[in-house]
Amino acid sequence: MLSAKGYLYAPRDARATVSLTRRDPRETRLGLQLFGREPDLIARAAAELSDKGFAFIDLNMGCPAPKITGNGEGSALMREPELAQAVAAAAVRATHLPVTVKIRAGWDSATAPELARRLQDAGVRAIAVHARTRMQFYSGKADWSVIQAVKRAVSLPVIGNGDIVDGESAARMLEETGCDGLMVARAAQGNPWIFAQIRAHLRGEPWNAPSVEERVCTALRHLDMQIALDGEEHAVREMRKHIAWYVSGLRGSARLREKINALPRAQQVRDCLLEYAAQL
């Protein structure tokens, strides 16, 4: 998620700007998500980023973080539907790429269908709906009926998000809402296998959960990729939370987290993970 204002006014070699716009050559269908509330800045950023190899531009109108909504950005735009429509229309006019939008159910009530119609009029190509209001943040139960209402309100592809945790819940969302696609968020933290699990469930195929060895090997691969992206020092700090997610629920994971959080070097992290796996 990249701030349009930050992208336009921060030094182009700033660490955050560089890392948020970097792509792996193997990522051929990667979108770039922008956020902001000024239509002209969104348009300028979308135009400048259109030739960077991304497949589409996504506008974030769903982020609930106070540091974002406090500036009237993210899900705060759901309280200003006319401005949200203007932001989307500006992006659509500025780029040859498809423009999509991520929204929530609403700010404190379900206003998503009304906003979705405005976004459709603005020319966006798809809408993703997190079925919680901003006031819920990530608590409580996602109201999937909002996704269904958005699907009925527009003729665009609608992507459902919220409380998809496994293959069974993915299938239920598709059936109950009629949505065209699924978005998995927190359930993928430390669990990249969830996508294979969902695919297998929808196809009626068997699926085997990853072994401890596979979890650890994947965490190590993730560490190496993070180092290649950010350098060792930053990667080691960033990976602490990811490793905690990878080993969540395993015996001795709390003690492992304590050890990992105290290690400053990548090789120390590798050795610690391998030793942990060997003891299970």
Describe each model-derived feature in a short phrase:
Residues T28-L34, I57, V99-I103, V129, ...:
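Hydrophobic faces of well-ordered beta-strands that scaffold small-molecule active sites
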Residues A94-H96, S109-A126, S145, A149-G160, ...:
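Alpha/beta catalytic cores of nucleotide-metabolism and tRNA/nucleoside-modifying enzymes
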Residues L34, S75-A76, S139, W207, ...:
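Pocket-edge positions in alpha/beta enzyme catalytic cores
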Residues D40-I57, M61-E73, P81-L156:
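Alpha/beta enzyme core
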Residues M1, K5, M61, A131, ...:
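Short secondary-structure boundary segments
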Residues E80-L83, V87, T218-A219, M239:
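Hydrophobic alpha-helical membrane-association signature
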Residues G36-P39, G62, G106, D163-I164, ...:
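Short, surface-exposed acidic/glycine-rich loop or hinge patches that mediate macromolecular interfaces
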Residues M1-D51:
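Glycine-rich, positively charged N-terminal anion/phosphate-binding segment
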